[in-house]
Design a protein with these regions (language model features):
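Glycine-rich phosphate-binding loop used to anchor ATP phosphates in small-molecule kinases
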Residues: 64-90
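A glycine- and Lys/Arg-enriched "phosphate-lid" helix/loop adjacent to the NTP-binding pocket
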Residues: 110-149
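PAPS-dependent sulfotransferases, especially Golgi type II membrane carbohydrate sulfotransferases
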Residues: 1, 139-150, 154-169, 173-250
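Conserved phosphate-donor/acceptor-positioning beta-strand/loop module used by diverse small-molecule
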Residues: 92-115
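Hydrophobic/aromatic beta-strand patches that form the interior of the parallel beta-sheet core
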Residues: 3, 27, 97-99, 168-170
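PAPS-dependent sulfotransferase catalytic core
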Residues: 1-68, 204, 250
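Short aromatic-enriched loop/helix-cap "lid" or pocket-rim segments at secondary-structure transitions
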Residues: 38-44, 89, 110-114, 120-121, ...
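PAPS/PAP-binding and catalytic site of the sulfotransferase fold
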Residues: 12-25, 88-93, 113, 168-192
Length: 250
């Protein structure tokens, strides 16, 4: 089975990969290069015919998944699955399982916004792209896009849901709940080991309720200053640049 996680980012997907690695024998990764971000993300979401560079990135992605699979099993929690490389994955594999990992939209928005403009901007869908399910007429600002992404990712999961072998709905608030993982493993038919509790170093502290801080208050003030400005599409580097950094040459 090939298991992927549909999520917006800022949902604990890295932590989930560490739990899979700890409790199962499935090769488990958070984000395996090529990430299929940047120009690859834009190309596959905005054009009917993808470029040679995008095809190459997807070929490398599928090759990596096959190479790192063990007995046909593989797990990756990369949020680009539902945004970008779902098309080649669904074409290449018949046994695709999907976890819908979701966090409430306001916390997701604040977590993205707190990181700031151009920190992960090439991992964000832009609302006016042609293949979006919830497409807007005009481009939006970065902060508007981060909120819109939450709804677009949800719609994309529902759009593909019946084509997955099995799915599982996983609430962010259950990231530290071992019983929830056991239910997930049993639903997917994955052998797993039980432990008394997650190691302290593995616990996701972001699950804990935290008060709104002055940092977030100042962030919202900054966002409000620009909220009504016209949106503008931002540019990306090619995904090929990232692949070269990992020693993959076209």
């Amino acid at each position: 089975m090939k298991i992927f996680v549909a999520n917006t980012g800022r949902c604990g997907s890295k932590f989930m990969a560490s739990v899979f690695e700890l409790l199962t024998d499935i090769p488990s990764y958070h984000e395996m290069a090529p990430y299929c971000i940047g120009e690859t993300l834009k190309d596959v979401n905005n054009n009917e015919v993808i470029s040679e560079n995008t095809r190459f990135a997807f070929q490398q992605k599928i090759a990596k998944i096959k190479h790192y699979s063990k007995n046909g099993d593989y797990f990756e929690s990369n949020n680009m699955f539902i945004k970008s490389f779902i098309w080649p994955v669904m074409a290449a594999f018949e046994d695709v399982y999907c976890i819908y990992l979701h966090r409430n939209p306001m916390d997701t928005f604040l977590s993205h916004a707190d990181r700031g403009w151009k920190f992960g901007y090439d991992w964000i869908l832009q609302s006016h792209w042609k293949k979006n399910l919830l497409k807007t007429k005009n481009p939006m600002l970065y902060y508007e896009n981060t909120m819109w992404n939450w709804f677009e990712v949800r719609e994309r999961f529902f759009h593909w849901e019946n084509q997955f072998t099995k799915t599982y709905d996983f609430d962010f608030r259950n990231l530290n709940n071992l019983e929830e993982y056991y239910k997930l493993f049993e639903h997917f038919g994955i052998p797993y080991k039980k432990i008394a509790k997650l190691p302290e170093t593995e616990r996701n502290e972001n699950v804990l309720n935290k008060p709104v801080t002055s940092r977030y208050e100042s962030l919202m003030e900054e966002i409000n200053k620009h909220w009504d400005n016209p949106g503008k599409e931002w540019a990306f580097d090619s995904d090929i640049k990232d692949m070269k950094a990992y020693g993959v040459n076209k």
